[in-house]
């Protein structure tokens, strides 16, 4: 004898069927078409271009205002740097930004292999997020299974912390006992250098072009700098895809 389906089971099945379309919409990755302003945060000068150069060019071509923030640089390892102006790798970053049509959000001033913690780095990133107020933030995936670079892991986690902290009015601490009034909620957090992509970006319209010319002029000026150690890129189009993990993607009702 066939067992009857209980009323409870029927209700659950019906509710699931009705709710599924809405759940699929809510759980879907954010669309790049909704981004008006983006902030790409890289551990080192070149990471954004290598990992997401094509996506950056794609966004810029769509009219998106794209900023770049560099966390680490060679200020302690560039032997030609005298403490003023820009280091070789900072110049490379600025040249890459100009080539791609990005805006510079600054250099945080941490040296390669910094002893600073992810929390300390996050506290420096949070005010910049609040100032720029991006719709989306992109950085390296700190959870990449094969990631062994401590700088990448540390900065990736710092960006995750800052992504959340920017929306809290009590972070980093109250000002004269009062909450912050410049908080900003970011709705999309994207990771490149990822092994779990959920979004593929078609960058075929961007075209292929080399990054090397933007560095060539820099190294001609730096006679003491050995070009064998250049941080130049071989291709500006970067990886043909980027991965996004929606840590916090909400639909506001406008209230």
Regions inferred by a protein language model and the residue ranges of each:
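Active-site rim/loop-helix segments in enzyme catalytic domains that contact anionic ligands
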Residues: 2-132
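Metal-dependent de-N-acetylase/amidase catalytic core
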Residues: 2-41, 118-255
């Amino acid at each position: 004898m066939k067992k009857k389906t209980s009323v409870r089971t029927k209700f659950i099945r019906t509710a699931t069927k009705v709710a599924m379309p809405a759940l699929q919409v809510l759980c879907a990755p954010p669309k790049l078409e909704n981004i008006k302003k983006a902030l790409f945060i890289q551990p080192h000068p070149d990471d954004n271009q290598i990992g997401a150069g094509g996506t950056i060019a794609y966004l810029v071509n769509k009219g998106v205002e794209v900023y770049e923030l560099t966390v680490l640089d060679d200020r302690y390892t560039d032997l030609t740097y005298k403490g003023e102006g820009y280091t070789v790798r900072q110049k490379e970053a600025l040249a890459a930004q100009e080539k791609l049509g990005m805006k510079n959000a600054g250099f945080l001033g941490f040296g390669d292999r910094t002893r600073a913690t992810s929390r300390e780095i996050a506290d420096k990133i949070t005010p910049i997020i609040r100032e720029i107020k991006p719709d989306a933030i992109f950085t390296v995936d700190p959870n990449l299974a094969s990631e062994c670079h401590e700088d990448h892991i540390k900065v990736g986690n710092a960006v995750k912390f800052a992504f959340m902290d920017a929306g809290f009015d009590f972070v980093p601490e109250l000002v004269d006992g009062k909450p912050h009034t410049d908080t900003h909620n970011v709705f999309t957090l994207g990771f490149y250098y990822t092994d779990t992509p959920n979004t593929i970006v078609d960058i075929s319209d961007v075209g292929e072009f080399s990054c090397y010319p933007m560095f060539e002029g820099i190294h001609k000026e730096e006679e003491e700098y050995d070009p064998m150690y250049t941080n130049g890129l071989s291709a500006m189009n970067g990886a043909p895809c980027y991965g996004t993990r929606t840590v916090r993607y909400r639909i506001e009702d406008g209230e």
